[in-house]
Regions:
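Accessory "access/gating" subregions that flank catalytic or transport cores
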Residues: 70-192
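C-terminal regulatory domains involved in ligand/effector binding and gene-expression control
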Residues: 1-121
């Protein structure tokens, strides 16, 4: 106010996906949560649920997500595939974009040039393919810095890690299937 006092006080929580809720909304969401078939609050509990029910982590997470969302497992897989597509698109944009990042610090994008160097080396000598995930992560982080569309998983600051591993898996593993991609993301979601 005019005397320098508080006008209003409110607690907000970041609940992921770029969304925030008030403390009242957060409490209401907790009350409205649907029961899940494989509840857990720690990694040890998740692993125990998987052992007890003879499930992979991705299977337990898939069943829980379907229960929470009130939809089929096929619908959850469709949504997870959509997340994978957003991650792939982010890497492709990051590898194609050139120039300076916004913000006035005159920081140039490096991912496209590093990718070009790796491609050139590949034709002339053995390349350590483990360098590719670093380039993919950098492409995502540069897209993030440029205000591009990223998936904030596990956090916005680490948004390049999961897409980089996913893209590397798809590109370099001959056994990569859509189901394995989805299982990877479901498992990564459980780990957070």
């Amino acid at each position: 106010g005019k005397d320098g006092g508080k006008l209003k006080e409110q607690i907000y929580y970041s609940v992921g996906g770029g969304f925030i809720v008030t403390d009242q909304e957060f409490d209401q969401q907790a009350e409205q949560t649907r029961p899940v078939p494989y509840p857990y609050t720690s990694c040890a509990e998740l692993l125990a649920q998987c052992r007890m029910n003879q499930l992979d982590i991705s299977e337990a997470v898939l069943a829980n997500e379907a229960a929470l969302a009130g939809c089929s497992e096929a619908e959850i897989r469709r949504r997870v595939a959509g997340v994978a597509d957003v991650m792939e698109g982010c890497i492709k944009r990051g590898l194609a974009a050139d120039g300076e990042l916004p913000g006035g610090l005159n920081v140039r994008r490096r991912a496209p040039q590093l990718a070009a160097k790796l491609k050139a080396l590949r034709e002339t000598e053995i390349v350590n393919t483990q360098l590719w995930p670093m380039v993919y992560a950098m492409a995502v982080n540069e897209e993030n810095a440029a205000g591009g569309r990223v998936v904030t998983a596990p956090t916005n600051g680490a948004a390049g890690i999961i897409p980089a591993v996913l893209h590397y898996f798809r590109k370099f593993n001959p056994h990569a299937t859509q189901e394995r991609v989805e299982n990877f993301l479901l498992t990564a979601g459980a780990i957070g």
